Amino acid sequence: MKCIKHPRIKLLLLFFLFSSLKMLAQNGTVTGIVKDAAGNALSDASVVVQAGKLGTRTNADGKFSLSLPAGVYTLIASFTGKSLAQKQITLAAGEAVSMDFSLADAGDLEGILVIGSRTPRRVSTETAVPVDVLNISELAIVAPQNNLNQLLNYVAPSFTSNTQTVADGTDHIDPAQLRGLGPDQVLVLLNGKRRHSSSLVNVNGTPGRGSVGTDLNAIPAFAIERIEVLRDGAAAQYGSDAIAGVINVVMKKSTNKLSASLYGGGNASTGANDHRGGMDGKQVQLDLNYGLGVGKGGFINFTGSLTSREDTRRATDFNGNLFNVYNAIENRALTGGVNLSSLFSNVNNTPNTAQIISTIKQYAPGVSYLTAAQQTNIQNATTISTLQGILNANVTKDELAFRGLERRNFNMRIGQSKLQSGQIFVNAELPISINHRFYLFGGYGIRDGNSAGFYRRPNQNRTLTEIYPNGFLPEIGSKITDASASVGVRGKILNGWNYDLSNTYGQNQFKYTVENTSNATQGINSARSFNAGKLGFMQNTVNLDLSHEYDVLAGLNLAFGGEVRLENYKITEGDQNSYERYDINGAAATPSTPATQLPTDFFGLARPAGAQVFPGFRPANALNKNRTSGAGYVDVELNPTKAWLLNAAVRYENYSDFGNTFNYKFATRVKLMTGLNFRAAIATGFRAPSLQQKYFNSTSTQFTGGVPFEVGTFSNESKPANLLGIPKLKQEDSDSYSAGFTYRVPKTSLTFTVDGYFVKIKNRIVLTGSFARPGGTPAGDLLTLQQLFDQAGATSATFFTNAINTESRGIDFIITNTFKYSDFSLKTDLAGTVSKTQKVGSIQASDILKNTGNLNNYFSEASRIYLESAVPRSKLALINTLTVKKLEFFLRHTYFGSVYDPNTADVNGNGLVEGATVNGQFIAVEHPIYGSRTITDFSVGYEISKAFRLTMGANNIFDIYPDRNLKTQTAANPLVGGGYGTPGTIDLSNNNQFEYSRNVSQFGFNGRFIFARLSVTL
């Protein structure tokens, strides 16, 4: 070790040492322990000086030490889920004082917030914008729900999320919305750090269509202490996506405690098992959480979660045609050892015509229920075309009886998907020194899902009856892997500056496997399962945040920082047989392959390419795209007086792919009287188009009115988009305004809050309606477009585009109260929201789209409904929690407002689907309305001992279902040029299969769910 030789440096060090000792001599010290009402030490509780900048946190043993100059102080102790406690102290120079705090359970969560304010010790009632604090660790014990999306759906009225059905990948990741805006217009944070989004784009007919959200269910609820929901625009503080607000998930920090939960339940409903009653949708979940104390105030907290969930089935029996005469004869031939369909690949181009005709005549008599006339006609036929007319007759009833089948054997799987998942998460903070801490948190999860598409019936050209004589139900298997890790260091530097330097990595992969299916163009050689490719999204974010509190006026907090983010999006192609169209020789077909060389069914209909239900991603779909962004912000909070708070924030952000944006926010809170606050905010915001929206492209099978269509989603930068005049994507911009009041009745726990808001969004990104493939023999650009459709195997196409402007407005209110007497306590929460979102102004489209009359394809009437009316405009939750000694009763009523179906029908029964002139065209605008419902949840918990607790109850205890779908009807639809056409069939139930709408639902349609949960704490 080298000695210090320079005398000036020695003098300087002695000066600093002397100054430090002098300062310590002038200070006093306050030490103590913070405990809960039961006497348990609270780790990481906050102890701060009221209206000051000094404070500390407790260590793993609940102990704290705070050095203060001589004076009179009010110290406030707080911990999430506990009431604040404050004590006054007079401290002399050099004095050491001991002061302990005991924190009772809070009626509302008043703990120190991570979001909404960059002042380190701001509580929810002090913020200038509305922030809800939800005690998820408590809800996860008493509530019937066991995943994060559903927990929030029933406790936070401004939040909406439901499981989807028959919607491809969206069956496996539930879209979530805040304040009726899109799933991608709410920012999700984990411990205050930006969470990565899902790799999945919602392209099917569900709320949130065209959006990319964050998979909240990738975070186990058992790992969560609380959730903070900022219900206000916050892009100036947090960056892209925070238009509707911010959801911050705060992980558990507990130490020296093992917690476990064993959960089981199922849907005991009259609608279970395709409306035959009993129970389905059985679930089992095991959760474990354990924390270790490390050093002085450090901790490592682990959570593991395993889930197994069966599917639910809510289909009704298909009432359409299943079998034709050809299916019956083919069946008799197979019984006789002859594969009739193997005699041809293309029925119009086969050397086996005579043998086919002969075989049909040979086995036709085995179909005993055919009439004599039918048998005679078959025996007299001399050509395939003649037989096609005869053998296409419907014989479903008789053939079902012959095969010993019922119509329910052909039911779809309509309901929640199957699920197997495993997750492990960690949250750690380790002291480096008195002023510096290292932290690490994140997790890894695997989720295997299985859902089903539309049943492929024997009489369809999509079905290889030589493989599946009775048709088949194709399945979509998903393997979702989600990984995240945040590492950083934070503390104090440079005379009181708080700093936080971190790196956050996250990735999400969605791998498709198509099962119990076939590629119809391969015939008998087709595989039964396919690797259909995968999607991948990666995000890496580096943040540096600095803040300092100053004794200016009644308090000033200055914060600034920067962010650098890298994003990557990948589409990986599937195996060739998952997407390819093969010719009759087994070679890959091309757009120039003659029709005579393409496989057909017996009736001459071309076999569709690729794996049924989800054709795999093609090499042309595969891509690997990156972008970077950088941002800087300044955030200032000033208290001119103790009763007045001002907040201002500005943020500049630059993206490598579309340029820069500048946003600001101003907010204020005024204490009007004891307990009564007024708050208001004005802000601009933005959302960058996601890489998924810019580059996603694929071909999928979508059903409209029970008819399958191969719909291609072309990227915004593709040639088809250019030929149709689809503009390049740019960011969404927003202006938001909010104002409200909070009131806490003095000397009580009764609290009222009400907030109104108004949000304008410009250049909102949507997924267009379908553009049909050009028919005939076009020339020029139309010919090019036709060829591009054919290369993608698509009959229609959709695109992502900035099409519209919207306005959203609403009112949120919350009332909370806790009444306690002896061993009795009653906590009551009433929360509600009323909101409205609507398109405003004209559709933003190119002249090409306007001149070709394509505006109503560009932004369709169905898209308008998904935007404005597919989620409830009103929602109300009344929650009562009654505790009597060792018993706890949980009762919740949740009101869901009405929603509109994006499909149109003759709702009023006048024989017409009412129309209106939109963009110069007369289109259908009459939509089914599904009325409001109130869902009741109830549970009873009993504390067997300090270590064991048993909770039993039900979600939707009265087994409530949404309104049923309209049945098949005959009505006239509007004609584009005006008037109404010839009456035709309208069937929203797809031949009676969908008892409830598959497109919208306020609360799902699984009915009553009963559960039991054993909680263990050691």
What are these regions (language model features)?
Residues 65, 193-231:
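Short acidic/polar hinge/loop motifs at secondary-structure boundaries
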